[in-house]
């Protein structure tokens, strides 16, 4: 068992040091942090200049931004007209999209509980999606 653990450790050490150096990739590229999309904004429209929605679970769109704050895509909210369980559906969608933080004007208790359980941070902001995301990255 100890021998197997040593082999795993050596392989992980090799992958973490040699491969990035040989390929010119940084550790951030290997981990995927910067390349993974990780910020979503509940929005009224599908553009990055859209107003942030005050209806988190029923927002018409979720705008996805990457780890550097660049706009990636807009996703139509499949739960926009859902009668019940919108917060669960939205949380599942955000997890599928590798979202780490959700921004909206306000969050209801059910949405907060679902996001916490999924490990998704949530921030309350108003304004346009692009302005708010840029302000977060300036901090």
Identify what each model region corresponds to:
Residues 2-82, 125-139:
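Non-catalytic interface/targeting segments
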Residues 47, 109-110:
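Short alpha-helical
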Residues 62-64, 97, 110-132:
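Short acidic, glycine/proline-enriched helix-loop-strand junctions
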Residues 72-101, 120:
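Compact, charge-rich alpha-helical regulatory domains located at protein termini
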């Amino acid at each position: 068992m100890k021998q197997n653990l040593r082999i795993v450790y050596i392989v992980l050490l090799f992958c973490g040091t040699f491969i990035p150096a040989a390929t010119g990739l940084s550790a951030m590229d290997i981990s995927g942090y910067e390349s993974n999309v990780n910020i979503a904004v509940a929005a009224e429209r599908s553009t990055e200049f859209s107003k942030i929605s005050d209806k988190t679970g029923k927002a018409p769109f979720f705008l996805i931004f990457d780890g550097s704050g660049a706009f990636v895509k807009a996703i139509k909210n499949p739960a926009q007209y859902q009668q019940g369980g919108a917060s669960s559906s939205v949380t599942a969608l955000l997890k599928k999209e590798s979202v780490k933080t959700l921004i909206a004007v306000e969050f209801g208790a059910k949405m907060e509980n679902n996001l916490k359980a999924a490990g998704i941070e949530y921030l309350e902001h108003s304004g346009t999606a692009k302005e708010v995301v840029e302000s977060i990255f300036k901090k």
